[in-house]
Every structure is written in structure tokens, then in C-alpha cells.
């Protein structure tokens, strides 16, 4: 009996070290990249609450976390967001940003319109209509650097785009797109990162 309990405890301990990614399971290691808070224009950050307090439709209006740069490999982001107020529209929620010399700039941007439409800023593809005020939405991005970038909404694959090689980083929060404006408040939770 004691041997059986010891074996069971050993299995539990071994299992607790496994990094369980919500999509595309297998072979992931959890990681905790550092980040910097970015507040510009009327952007305000309070832990995982991100606000654009103005209706300005020009200039740099952002409230975000910018995570450390990665190069090569496969990286998965997961987070849950809830739009708690949306007086504006076309607010970017999650970005994968190219940090490669000569190619730096937004590579993938997930944004929300008033009414709940979630879309890819580059190309305009609709990913979901789940981003309504008050709804909690899970976002996963899987980025195989040099191959492709995949976006999942509530566990379902919704968008795939080819990826160049180089260096990238993740951002999330609330950011006015070129055709957008606030005000808006977005709460994020349960943010996790993995790599393989």
C-alpha cells in the first residue's frame, strides 16, 4: 500500500512539471518573459486593466504590455480578455510585432470593433464576433518563426499567415489602430507563455 502511494505521488510530481498548452499540445515548456508597460497619449495601465480614456482619432493612443523579444523557435501566447466598455471602435488587443532590423513593425494585430467583431488588422479578415462588451474571450497565438503564425479564438483556429524569420515580441492591451478611436477599457487575465 505504501509503495503504491509513493508511486502515485511520484507520478503527480512528474506530471506537475509538464507545461500544458491549451492548443497544439505536446512538447511545450512554460516561460515567463519580462515586459515593459507602455502608456502613451490617453492610455492608462493598472496591472491587467488597459484603458484609452479619450475619443481622439489621431496620434499614438496606447495602454499595453510589451514583452521581451524572441528569435527563432515556436512560441505560444495565451490570454483571456474582456472588453468592459467600448465607446470607440477598432482597438487592437493583441499584437505580434516584428523586431528585425529593416523589417520592424506590426506583423499581426488582433483588433475589436464596437459590436464585437474580432479581426486581423492586416488584411481585414474576420476571426470571430465574440468580442462583445462583457464577454470573456480566450486568445492563443502560435508563432513558428520562419514558417507561420496561427491565431485561435476560444480554442478554434481562426487565422493563419506566413511568417518570416527574425526577431519578434508579443504585446497586448488596448491600442488605437490607424482607423480607430477610444474610449475603451479592456481587462486581461490568465496570461501564459510557452516555447518549443
Task: Please tell me what each predicted stretch does.
Residues 51-58, 121-127, 153-157:
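Secondary-structure transition/turn motif
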Residues 43-45, 49-115, 195:
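Secretory/extracellular carbohydrate-interaction modules
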Residues 134-150, 154:
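Localized edge beta-strand/strand-to-loop motifs within extracellular or lumenal beta-rich domains
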Residues 28-49:
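Extracellular glycan-recognition surfaces and repeat-rich motifs
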Residues 103-108, 125-129, 156-161:
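Surface-exposed loop/edge segments in extracytoplasmic proteins
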Residues 23-31, 114-140:
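Short, aromatic/His-centered strand-loop micro-motif at the edge of beta-sheets
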Amino acid at each position: 500500500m505504501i509503495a503504491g502511494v509513493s508511486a502515485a505521488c511520484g507520478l503527480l510530481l512528474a506530471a506537475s512539471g509538464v507545461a500544458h498548452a491549451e492548443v497544439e499540445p505536446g512538447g511545450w515548456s512554460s516561460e515567463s518573459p519580462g515586459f515593459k508597460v507602455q502608456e502613451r497619449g490617453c492610455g492608462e495601465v493598472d496591472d491587467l486593466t488597459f484603458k484609452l480614456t479619450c475619443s481622439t482619432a489621431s496620434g499614438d493612443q496606447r495602454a499595453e504590455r510589451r514583452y521581451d523579444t524572441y528569435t527563432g523557435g515556436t512560441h505560444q501566447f495565451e490570454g483571456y480578455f474582456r472588453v468592459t466598455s467600448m465607446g470607440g471602435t477598432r482597438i487592437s488587443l493583441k499584437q505580434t510585432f516584428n523586431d528585425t532590423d529593416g523589417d520592424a513593425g506590426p506583423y499581426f494585430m488582433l483588433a475589436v470593433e464596437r459590436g464585437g467583431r474580432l479581426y486581423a488588422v492586416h488584411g481585414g479578415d474576420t476571426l470571430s464576433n465574440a468580442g462583445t462588451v462583457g464577454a470573456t474571450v480566450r486568445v492563443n497565438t502560435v508563432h513558428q518563426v520562419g514558417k507561420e503564425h496561427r491565431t485561435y479564438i476560444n480554442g478554434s483556429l481562426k487565422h493563419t499567415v506566413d511568417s518570416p524569420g527574425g526577431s519578434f515580441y508579443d504585446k497586448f492591451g488596448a491600442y488605437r489602430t490607424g482607423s480607430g478611436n477610444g474610449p475603451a477599457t479592456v481587462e486581461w487575465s490568465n496570461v501564459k507563455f510557452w516555447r518549443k
